[in-house]
């Protein structure tokens, strides 16, 4: 267990991080980069991150002190007022900085939302001449989350009061413009919460602050245009997000703070949602079934028999929204679910990443020979996969208590599990803590000690009807006991399948080897090897009846099934720009469509291009390069742009010579068409050459990234991650078979190790041949990467965290402590993010490379957290439970449908442990044999054609007892195929034309028939009829094979008629747009 060694671990991280910084500082100081300083500052805590992000010096100390006694929300409001008071001489700056610093605190100082989510803060005037505050939001505000979005408006309100600025008074016409925009935005992007027009009116009429936004969408409003105080006709996405998903959706949370601070104008939020009780709303349990994509199967309908059975607990690789299933289930589902795959779920949240747990129940299947069996191993599943008639039960899905707590979902009734049953054991029965009773012992124990029936012998009685129970009782009365089995008539096979009882079918008879609990539950017993009826008592329902017949308490075995479908498949792969790029070197059109620097050089091109200008420190020459082309000395930034003529061939040869590389040995070397940074700053070409030499590509910020799905792990076995005991101990762990993982250690895929090995060689080559320093990594194999540091960074954030590689898995995802994921503001519901080698980030990242467009700062390491603080990470990780065994009171609470927060203290969540001054020494309730045991690559990623994908998806629906195959077919057509066909069909007649040589686009073909930019005559359509008809055959096939609703069949037939008549498909003619025009 981790205890005092955590201090040593943190000190080791500090030491090795500072070593990398020293190397990077020495390299950067040579003047061979666009900046002479390392551009990723270390922030030791949230206070420093906020200071670095917002560039307000001197507030870190106060943030740090007040955070000890205030909640994050209270702290943000207090510091915002403080900042405003310091800057009150400039009211606009005071407002701007106050709102941004408040939002930065709310988002732990690692999101880009405070910088880019707020485009501007202004003071404007109402029609009566009074002043008001306007906040202009943009798209990146989404990453802040609804509560932080709403509180940013509240912060502006509080600050404008401090500065004596009046309230916003909207006109009726402006309010109607907002309503039109919200409806249009929801149609384009889909809001998490779509408010009613009255709710929008209510908030806007009473909001003292104008919630504005920049025009983020191409689409414009059709009415309420050219308004004086709304400066764009385009739809304002940022405004829609803050208004709908912020203030209105999070109204209850906002009220908590407005009431405390006596902001009475906001009391109107109490009326949000009050009039919705009579409205027809979609059944929440079916939300996960929306927008089904072709090729991604549905595994179970809401609470339908045969689906995943809810089981409470946390494996060592679940929690933080991740759930575990038996690896055999992955195989039985035709490998569609792999380790790390996302599934959309009915409860407790919206989605979960899937991990393996072989200590929970696996699936049951009916074979073509009529046998009903439990599939107990992947090998067995592989053997029978072509002999499966029906999948009758998917087994259990393990969901942690902490996920119910996080989603504030009342606890659903737990099945009667072994861990619950053990609480009934006394000292006499302690032997059964280590082994299961057989069928006879189970019944006798229950009778003698008045205990519920042992789990597994309780069956799914709630899944059959009273009529079916009576048929089963009659069949048992005529059953025959033979040696160690019972023979029943095959007429009751469907009833036994529903009950989850195994049997073999032989000569129209069913042979049961496990039968004694069944006959006892139905009012029979064995006397002299004969089945004898001993009870005939009846109740109103099946479960009550079997309790009465048996005289034994039989609890529900599967009271809750969890509906699910495949979401995103797991992901692991190096980050590539599109197309792949080796360096941020602009080529315009000189490199051709492949952006080849080598081809541009061979053509002898002299490029005339505007770039960021630099001045030689020695001779004063102006150049875009970091080295002077005349004297070879370093240059410095002049903070200006200028047109330069660049001899690409000479630039390439000079760069290759400086890094001792023969260009002839490099197969491809790709640049970019143009630079997106503010001043078109060019990256040293030497770096692109070395990346190409080592087969790696670049991200927009100059770093080499590897993307992976996020998967939690709290404990690992050294032999499952390619470690030896000796290496394990060198990393600071004990020599135990199972170790609790340190908070910033990560286990990466083998493929990631292979990629990072090449990156390490690139870095060493760079250090030696470009900077003239010694190598650092010196890795000869993937195993040499163990112990090296990385930066973990999530999309939509601007703060990285140091991580350490400790091993490899065969899984397409990154196993790491829940705290590590939460430090990046991620959970494990299918999220993915990236890592880069620490020294790569320090040497090669530059803010000057980042795009100047909105969102350009996202996914960039603007600050780096060295040691994570559990108090400053995403709070979801604090809800992870840590018990080895859930207490009896937990199961009693599920019987009462209790709120999860009511039992939080007994469940020992991370939050409870931290209050006690520790967060290590935790446990888990279910073991997993091997974290790589299970399907490792989702079938969705290996199936090629759409025809095969839809065939596999619907083929699985056909054999799943928990799925309605006809409904799945209808949903696939309605949510995927038909919108695609309709959209492309409409776009065909309004499309642009494109030059294949320079990519210029035209609304109409130029009269000359040639491109006006490059003169090429090869101008083509951007939408071909093939994109319209590509799903037609699959649509027809599905319509003919499945029973679809009449309205859908009519809709499809009408669409087919339109398309076939337009393109004359029946006669085999390929009608072009020219032909259509001529026919007119």
Swiss-Prot record:
One of its GO terms (molecular function) is DNA binding. It comes from the Archaea. Its EC number is 2.7.7.7, 3.1.11.1. Keywords: DNA replication, DNA-binding, DNA-directed DNA polymerase, Exonuclease, Hydrolase, Multifunctional enzyme, Nuclease, Nucleotidyltransferase, Transferase. GO terms for biological process: DNA catabolic process; DNA-templated DNA replication. It catalyses: DNA(n) + a 2'-deoxyribonucleoside 5'-triphosphate = DNA(n+1) + diphosphate; Exonucleolytic cleavage in the 3'- to 5'-direction to yield nucleoside 5'-phosphates. It holds the Pfam family PolC_DP2_N. The keyword Nuclease applies. The keyword Nucleotidyltransferase applies. Disulfide bonds: none annotated. InterPro entries: PolC_DP2, PolC_DP2_cat_dom, PolC_DP2_central_dom, PolC_DP2_N. Heterodimer of a large subunit and a small subunit. Possesses two activities: a DNA synthesis (polymerase) and an exonucleolytic activity that degrades single-stranded DNA in the 3'- to 5'-direction. Has a template-primer preference which is characteristic of a replicative DNA polymerase. Belongs to the archaeal DNA polymerase II family. This is DNA polymerase II large subunit. It comes from Picrophilus torridus (strain ATCC 700027 / DSM 9790 / JCM 10055 / NBRC 100828 / KAW 2/3).
